[in-house]
């Protein structure tokens, strides 16, 4: 993997920085593991905008990822590493000994031809998936389940990981990259190691059009709008917002907690916020 600073042949390429991985597969993805997805453009079933700054972009197939890793005791060989337009991490196509192929999140350090395993008897090696009760304390893990059998939900982005801090009774404590410490059931599964493509954060888009390819639309400042469109809008000439920063719907935007899921609050031992 290399970081390439593009030659400034145009204003759009002057600040562009690419992350190039020559190990990625250059052909088409595995057709049996593709699914269609239509662009929602940030709208719900009523056509109302529920997520701003989304729309357009290139058409993409969804790659069906195996987040459960439930084929216990069956060795799998990494056939190739691939780019996935739907996520920051790369994915790996693995071939199981029984002939089935699946996509998984590509862990850091996993190479083509390497053998992976799942289950409680799998060795503690990068890319193997085990129940947390079988993982030694202090191990770096990723793709962590929040409920047993539901599939990985935490630490799935490029370069992310978590650390298994302790086990007590039916629950273990896991420290996430944000600093939050959560309780996770010991029957939940996790994958050893870190997520690959850790240099993803070093890339520079370079121009606005590259974000439009990705389906990201422009972000307009509230003070540049009319008062009917935003609480910061209006005024003669360039004026300040006149109040603390808020969203278009009046919710404070700096430091205001918006978490509403009280059901799982008991699973948070230490919040990522220090205060």
Curated annotation (Swiss-Prot):
Residues 224-257 are annotated as: Disordered. Gene3D superfamilies: 2.30.30.30, Nucleic acid-binding proteins, Ribosomal protein L2, domain 3. The keyword Nucleotidyltransferase does not apply. It comes from the Bacteria. It holds the Pfam family Ribosomal_L2_C. One of its GO terms (cellular component) is large ribosomal subunit. Keywords: Ribonucleoprotein, Ribosomal protein, RNA-binding, rRNA-binding. The keyword Ribonucleoprotein applies. PROSITE patterns: RIBOSOMAL_L2 (PS00467). GO terms for biological process: cytoplasmic translation. GO terms for molecular function: rRNA binding; structural constituent of ribosome; transferase activity. Belongs to the universal ribosomal protein uL2 family. Part of the 50S ribosomal subunit. Forms a bridge to the 30S subunit in the 70S ribosome. One of the primary rRNA binding proteins. Required for association of the 30S and 50S subunits to form the 70S ribosome, for tRNA binding and peptide bond formation. It has been suggested to have peptidyltransferase activity; this is somewhat controversial. Makes several contacts with the 16S rRNA in the 70S ribosome. This is Large ribosomal subunit protein uL2. It comes from Burkholderia mallei (strain NCTC 10229). The gene is rplB.
């Amino acid at each position: 993997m290399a970081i390439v600073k593009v030659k400034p042949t145009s204003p759009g390429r002057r600040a562009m920085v690419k992350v190039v991985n020559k190990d990625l597969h250059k052909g088409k993805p595995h057709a049996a593991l593709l699914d269609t997805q239509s662009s929602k453009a940030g709208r719900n079933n009523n056509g109302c905008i529920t997520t701003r700054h989304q729309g357009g972009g290139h058409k993409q197939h969804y790659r069906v990822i195996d987040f459960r890793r439930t084929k216990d005791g069956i060795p799998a060989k990494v056939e190739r590493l691939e780019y996935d337009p739907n996520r920051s991490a790369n994915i790996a196509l693995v071939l199981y000994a029984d002939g089935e192929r699946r996509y998984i999140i590509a862990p850091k350090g996993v190479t083509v031809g390497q053998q992976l395993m799942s289950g409680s008897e799998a060795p503690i090696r990068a890319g193997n998936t085990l129940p947390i009760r079988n993982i030694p304390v202090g191990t770096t893990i990723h793709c962590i389940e929040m409920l047993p059998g539901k599939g990985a939900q935490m630490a799935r982005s490029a370069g992310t990981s978590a650390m298994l801090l302790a086990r007590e009774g039916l629950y273990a404590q896991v420290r996430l990259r944000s600093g939050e410490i959560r309780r996770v059931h010991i029957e939940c599964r996790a994958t050893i190691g870190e997520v690959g493509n850790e240099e993803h954060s070093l890339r520079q888009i370079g121009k606005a059009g590259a974000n439009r390819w990705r389906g990201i639309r422009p972000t307009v400042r509230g003070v540049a709008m009319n008062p009917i469109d935003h609480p910061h809008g209006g005024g003669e000439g360039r004026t300040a917002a006149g109040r603390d920063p808020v969203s278009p719907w009046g919710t404070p935007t700096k430091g205001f907690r918006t978490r509403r899921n009280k059901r799982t609050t008991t699973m948070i031992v230490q919040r990522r916020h220090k205060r």
